[in-house]
Curated annotation (Swiss-Prot):
Key words, A-Z: DNA-directed RNA polymerase, Nucleotidyltransferase, Transcription, Transferase
Subunit structure, as described in the record: The RNAP catalytic core consists of 2 alpha, 1 beta, 1 beta' and 1 omega subunit. When a sigma factor is associated with the core the holoenzyme is formed, which can initiate transcription.
Cellular component annotations (GO), alphabetically ordered: DNA-directed RNA polymerase complex
A biological process term (GO) from this entry: DNA-templated transcription
EC number: 2.7.7.6
Protein name (database record): DNA-directed RNA polymerase subunit beta
Taxonomic classification: Bacteria, Pseudomonadati, Pseudomonadota, Gammaproteobacteria, Thiotrichales
InterPro entries: DNA-dir_RNA_pol_bsu_ext_1_sf, DNA-dir_RNA_pol_bsu_external_1, DNA-dir_RNA_pol_su2, DNA-dir_RNAP_su2_dom, DNA-dir_RNAP_su2_hyb_sf, RNA_pol_bsu_bac, RNA_pol_bsu_CS, RNA_pol_bsu_protrusion
Length: 1358
């Protein structure tokens, strides 16, 4: 096994028995692939049947009303974005690119005859159709400067669905759901009548739809019912027994007798195959029936007197005596009737026709029109147009390829081509037939929660739909413009207005329910957000109406949606996460991978199955035992089939799971020993990992699952090498790789990677990248070059490994509280940097422009000390609450001054009185360091000094960066040819003769540009130098062009909102240490609040004097059933012990041979998966050992983790007791505790619920407008609510004065509180109470009812 650059530095020991069959696919592919499919930029490769291309093709051509103009679509191009991703975030712009569509305007001769079209002119040009947001490399969008994610939606797939309602009768219904257009429902009522509804409007008979389609009453009966022939004569009535085989399984309503009157089959018996044979053998072809039975029948076809053409009876008329007499009169002695005798099947449609009052197609169309447009008078043309537009015109109704596939599959017919996306007559007939079959018990209703009936709508499809909406509006505009514009040389540009497209797309990205502000607490929360599947949103469910069934875990979720990871609140089960190996197929259905089993042998061939396909197969679990030839060891094995868990013979198995972790999501797959935890706690664990705050120093988990590196790699937060090469330069801002062009498929000699430094994330955490490579290191493509935030050597690192003791300590871990050691605070283990952004906007007001200036009236010099001359705070200044960040003055209305004041103003030249200080100040409860300032101005007033200074710094930095980049390219070009040219014969060189030998000394005097002008006699060498010269010149031109582009984007004017003159953004870094009140958690749902930080000397300690870091309450485990944390602690202790063992060996010797022996014991003595130490050279072994001192990292994959024996063996090697317990001593007394305590290493996270963000106190502040009571909440600087129950408490204690204070001066007694404030200032401690404002509100509300309520001011004596 080969190891990557980062893995060699710290190899993770892997447990687990199952072989590695398939790599976890790229985690963000659901986003990137979907949007790529939408844009399909590369037209050369052929654009697919989706995305922009198909929408444009469907919308064009557009024809003018008079037929003179036609606008055709030809092609489209997507331009280059104005700013790059970083620039967009800084400027608050949207990362998008212009869409230019090539349109062809065909002009026809208006004088031509009506039926002929003569082309007069064709005009073609590219038309701007708005800006399309582009996706970043990490699957996000930058909209107005913020990163957003479009969450995929799980919605009901288009197609037909049959269901049964929950009422006692259990009425059956069918619903045809298109991708776009009207819904069509058919439903049975309790009487067996079939009703239809369009778009859930008023119901009407289902046969009305059939008549509207052009079917006659006779044809409808023929389609849906069998007919039988009855003969009659003077002896009575007889029923012909033809198609006997169709009667199998039906209940007989009469005896069947032979010619000798022997009963062959008795009445009320179900007919079997044997009975049919008996009847045939007896030669019985008809059976006598009585008139009572005949009178229940109905006529199957119209009965016409052939002689006169008179209609005796219509199809579906009842068979009556008078009808039979009429038949006899005209000599008809046999009658074709609907078969109600041998089957009930035909009765449903027959009964429905009885209710249906329409007689023909026209009447049926009018009936449908009345239902859809009640109150509108039906006109013949509009009636037909409405009905056809509902289901038969592709621009208004589309099943889409998915709907057509599902409809054909459900009805089991391929009569309709899969390219027809509208409804056909056979579809509607087929749906009604299937509904009747289901009612008769011959079919099954659909399970709406089955993932075969729900599909994923990803970002590309949603943007495509928005684009279609915008384009539809543009199309209407084009038609209007064509008829209004009268220009001789009309061009496509003149008639296309692209604003509706831009508006539709902008609305979707800014205010759509599924376009969300990216969760960016840490890399895992980013990845999980992009892999989220929501059932909410437009076209989906609403959380109020979603029942238990929709939210529940379904058998088809296996390997597709994670059964664990979902929110805990009202959205539980409606928001899911994609399972680790799942993917979305072309139809939008979720697929899971399986290994194919052929003749009892499990192959390595992988097949992806959708939920529909999977129902038909028997699938074995990943953990099923196989022999060395990949055959099943056991004869009877546990499998899944049709949604059930079964035990079956191994010979029946057709597929096998790929991996044990394929059932869970990426977040759940990060939890070691997941299989030993209760599911409710795992849900919390998976959700809380997403809330972990990245700390100052990242530390890998000692006990992981092997999924850490995959999440870190795919999150896009690490820098990954693009090509093979050698590290040429490293500093904190960039890494330069000299590319090995022979091994890499690229002509670039140099790869330069810029690192992100101290960037603010969406959650105000700090994004910072650190290089992990050194100059001279050899790297392969795909190796990690730099760690991002919350990663350590390319592994996800959300928290820290702490030594945990499960023991109570003086009540400080009551109810899940956590007791922490002071060492953790001193070592800055959980110290995190948070970057807050403060914005100050100077606007143009009615009274004049606001101004950002350091000259502010009535503000002390000390308050302005941290500002520069422009009135903006310096970078590096330490700011406290209340400090001015940006000094700003706002003009206020002129005041009328007295003559004395005017005189004084004139004497002292005071003019600042007509402005008010509206500076941006640091909010209460925060302090930090200013790390960055950005100034945006419009061009009107010229740029301020600070803006010019920032601009100059950015341009100088860019120039320095590009110069350094060019210097690297120069050195690489030099080193690539230097060895070969030294000692070569010269053809031509300035300062040397022809044929002279080139020396190193001569080269040292020349710059590289002069080197490359020398020509050589050796042709091969000359060619190599020529190539180097071309590369050098191209690189120089490219770098100059890049610099100019960067300079242009830096100096480019800013588009500020209307009325805004200047915007200043100040970024302040705030350092937060862990403290009591902060929330912490493990990975098993074990969460708690820090109750106390205890001095190290008071913490319990081991026999060797090592104090523990954390004390956790052991009572938090039994009731919660998350035993995984105990196993993690044991394995963590073993890992720590192994690290100590390596450290001791290092102290004795640094010889690689000795170290290899220790490493061999540590890595390869326990567990099935061995580490190939031979692949590492001696230097790498030494580096590895140095990195393992703190503990040997271990991977225990979910459902395939370390066993109890493995943990015991490792504990033994690490030098600990195999039960993981030890004697601890009290740090305060030095005495041992009464019994041994479980001690181990657990990975703990600090969550984004920090006490600093929640702690809040109010003195005086803002009040509510109506009630005049203080506002609530920290954001409003509000007060604490003294509610109803608290009032009762004070009443119960008789605390009258306290109660009066609470309900008046501290709340809404306006006069009383201002008097109180004055009294406190004056040093008087008295309280004057007035009427609370809420009483006035009540009084006014009562007055609004017409009752005058007021105080009775008269004295008692009166």
């Amino acid at each position: 096994m080969s190891y990557s650059y980062a893995e060699k530095k710290r190899i993770r020991k892997e447990f687990g028995v199952l072989p590695h069959i398939l790599d976890v696919p790229y985690l963000l592919s659901i986003q990137t692939e979907s949007y790529k499919k939408f844009l399909t930029v590369d037209a050369a490769k052929g654009r697919l049947h989706s995305g922009l291309e198909i929408v444009l093709k469907q919308s064009f051509p557009v024809e003018s009303k008079n037929g003179q103009y036609e606008l055709h679509y030809v092609d489209y191009q997507i331009g280059e974005p104005t700013f790059d991703e970083t620039e967009c975030q800084v400027r608050g712009a949207t990362y998008d690119a212009p869409l230019n569509v090539k349109l062809r305007l065909v002009v026809y001769n208006k004088d031509a005859l009506p039926n002929e079209k003569i082309v007069e002119d064709i005009r073609e040009e590219y038309v701007y159709m708005g800006d399309i947001p582009l996706m970043t490399t990490n699957g996000t969008f930058i909209i107005n400067g913020t990163e957003r994610v479009v969450v995929s939606q799980l919605h009901r797939s288009p197609g037909v669905f049959f269901s049964k309602d929950d009422s006692e009768e259990g009425a059956f219904s069918a619903r045809i759901i298109p991708y776009r257009g009207s819904w069509l429902d058919f439903e049975f009522d309790s009487k067996g009548i079939i009703w239809a509804r369009i778009d859930r409007k008023r119901k009407f008979c289902a046969t009305v739809i059939l008549k509207a389609l052009g079917y006659t009453q006779e044809q409808i009966l023929e389609n849906f019912s069998e007919s039988k022939t009855i003969t009659f004569n003077s002896k009575g009535f007889a029923l012909r027994l033809d198609n006997l085989s169709n009667m199998k399984g039906e209940l007989l309503k009469f005896d069947i007798v032979d010619a000798q009157d022997n009963v062959i089959v008795k009445k009320n018996k179900k007919l079997t195959s044997r009975d049919v044979k008996k009847i045939k053998d007896a030669g019985v072809d008809s059976v006598a029936i009585d008139f009572d039975l005949v009178s229940t029948l109905r006529v199957a076809k119209d009965i016409v007197n052939e002689a006169t053409g008179e209609v005796i009876a219509y199809a579906n008329d009842d068979v009556t005596e008078s009808l039979l007499e009429s038949c006899v009169e005209v000599g008809m002695l046999e009658l074709e009737v609907i078969d109600f005798i041998t089957t009930e099947r035909g009765r449903y449609i027959s009964d429905t026709l009885k209710y249906d009052l329409t007689r023909n197609t026209d009447e049926a169309l009018v009936e449908i029109y009345k239902v859809l447009r009640p109150g509108d008078p039906p006109a013949a043309a509009s009636v037909k147009a409405l009905f056809e537009g509902l289901f038969f015109i592709e621009s208004r109704y589309s099943l889409s390829d998915i709907g057509r596939m599902k409809l054909n599959a459900r009805l089991g017919s391929d009569k309709v081509s899969k390219d027809i996306y509208t409804l056909e007559n056979s579809d509607i007939v087929g749906v009604i037939e299937e509904l009747i079959n289901i009612r008769d018990g011959k079919g099954k209703v659909d399970d709406i929660d089955h993932l075969g009936n729900r599909r994923v709508r990803s970002v590309g499809e949603m943007v495509e739909n928005q684009f279609r909406i915008g384009l539809y509006r543009v199309e209407k505009g084009i038609r209007e413009s064509m008829s209004l514009v009268h220009k001789d040389k009309l061009m496509p540009k003149d008639i296309v207005n692209s604003k509706p497209i831009t508006a539709a797309i902008k609305e979707f990205f800014t205010s759509g329910a599924l376009s969300q502000f990216m969760d960016q607490d840490n890399p895992l929360s980013e990845v999980t957000h992009k892999r989220r599947i929501s059932a909410l949103g437009p076209g989906g469910l609403s959380r109020d109406r979603a029942g238990f069934e929709v939210r529940d875990v379904h058998a088809t979720h296996y390997g597709r949606l994670c059964p664990i990871e979902t929110p805990e609140g009202p959205n539980i089960g409606l928001i899911n996460s994609l399972a680790s190996y799942a993917r979305v197929n072309d139809y939008g259905f979720l697929e899971a991978p399986y290994r194919k089993v052929v003749d009892g042998k499990v192959t390595d061939e992988i097949e992806y199955l959708s939920a529909i396909d999977e129902d038909n197969y028997v699938i074995a679990q990943a953990s099923t035992k196989l022999d060395e030839n990949n055959h099943f060891v056991e004869d009877i094995i546990q499998c899944r089939s049709g949604g059930e868990a079964i035990f079956t013979e191994s010979s029946r198995v057709q597929y096998m799971d790929v991996s044990a972790k394929q059932m869970v999501s990426a977040a759940a797959a990060l939890i070691p020993f997941l299989e030993h935890d209760d599911a409710n706690r795992v849900l919390m664990g998976a959700n809380m990992q997403r809330q972990a705050v990245p700390t100052l120093k990242s530390e890998k988990p000692l006990v992981g699952t092997g999924m850490e590196k995959i999440v870190a790699r795919d999150s896009g937060n690490c820098i990954i090498a693009r090509n093979v090469g050698e590290v040429a330069e490293v500093d904190s801002n960039r890494i330069v790789i000299k590319v090995d062009t022979e091994k890499s498929q690229t002509s670039n000699l140099v790869d330069i990677y810029s690192l992100t430094k101290f960037k603010r994330s969406n959650k105000n955490t700090c994004i910072n990248q650190r290089p992990i490579v050194n100059v001279g290191d050899k790297v392969e493509a795909g190796d990690i070059l730099a760690d991002g935030f919350a990663t350590d050597f390319g592994e996800l690192s959300l928290g820290h490994n702490l030594m945990v003791a499960f023991m109570p300590w003086n009540g400080y871990n009551f109810e899940d509280s956590i007791l922490l050691s002071e060492r953790i605070v001193k070592d800055d283990k959980y110290t995190s940097i948070h970057i807050e952004e403060f914005t100050c906007v100077a606007r143009d007001t009615k009274l004049g422009p606001e101004e950002i200036t350091a000259d502010i009236p009535n503000v002390s010099e000390s308050s302005l000390a941290k500002l520069d001359e422009s009135g903006i705070v310096h970078i590096g200044a330490n700011v406290e609450a209340g400090d001015i960040l940006v000094a700003k003055i706002t003009p206020k209305a002129e005041q009328q001054l007295t003559p004395e004041e005017r005189l004084l103003r004139a004497i002292f030249n005071e003019k600042a009185s007509n402005v008010v200080d509206s500076s941006l100040r640091m909010p209460s409860g925060t302090s930090g360091t200013v790390i960055s300032v950005q100034v945006f101005e419009n061009d009107k007033g010229g740029k301020s000094k600070r803006a010019l200074k920032i601009e100059k710094e950015l341009i100088d930095k860019a120039r320095k960066d590009f110069d350094e980049e060019f210097a690297v390219i120069e050195s690489v070009v030099k080193s690539s040819i230097e060895q070969e040219v030294v000692g070569a014969k010269i053809q031509k060189a300035k300062g040397l003769k022809k044929g002279a030998i080139l020396t190193k000394e001569f080269l040292a005097t020349l710059p590289l540009s002069k080197w490359l002008e020398i020509s050589f006699e050796d042709e091969k060498l000359e060619e190599k130098v020529q190539n180097a010269r071309e590369y050098y010149e191209e690189a120089k031109i490219a770098i100059d062009a890049k610099f100019e582009a960067k300079k242009k984007s830096i100096t480019q004017s800013n588009e500020l909102s209307p009325g805004v003159l200047k915007t200043v953004k100040v970024f302040v870094a705030i350092k937060k240490r862990i403290q009591p009140g902060d929330k912490m958690a493990g990975r098993h749902g074990n969460k708690g609040v820090v109750s106390r930080v205890l001095p190290v000397e008071d913490m319990p300690y081991m026999e060797d004097g090592t104090p523990v870091d954390v004390c956790l309450n052991p009572l938090g485990i039994p009731s919660r059933m998350n035993i995984g944390q105990i196993l993690e602690a044991h394995l963590g202790l073993a890992s720590y012990g192994l690290g100590k063992k390596i450290e001791k060996t290092l102290e004795k010797t640094r010889k690689a041979a000795e170290l290899r022996k220790t490493l061999e014991e540590v890595y390869n003595s326990v567990g099935d998966k061995k580490v190939n130490l031979e692949a590492l050279n001696d230097e790498e072994i030494l580096t590895l050992c140095d990195n393992l001192k703190g503990g040997v990292p271990i991977a225990t994959p979910v459902f395939d983790g370390a066993k109890e024996e493995d943990i015991k063996s490792l504990l033994k090697i690490g030098g600990f007791a195999t039960n993981g317990q030890m004697k601890l001593f009290d740090g305060r007394t030095g005495k041992p505790f009464d019994r041994h305590v479980t001690v181990g290493y657990m990975y703990m996270l600090k969550l984004d619920h920090l006490v600093d963000d929640k702690m809040h106190a109010r003195s005086t502040g803002s009040y509510s407008l109506v009630t005049q009571q203080p506002l609530g909440g920290k954001a409003q600087f509000g007060g604490q609510r003294f509610g109803e129950m608290e009032v009762w408490a004070l009443q119960a204690y008789g605390a009258a004065y306290t109660l009066r204070e609470m309900l008046t001066v501290k709340s809404d007694d306006i006069a009383g509180r201002s008097k109180m404030y004055k009294n406190i200032v004056d040093g008087k401690l008295t309280m004057n109470v007035d009427v609370p404002e809420s009483f006035n509100v009540l009084r006014n509300e009562v007055r609004a009812l017409g009752i005058d309520m007021d105080f009775d001011y008269s004295s008692e004596e009166e």
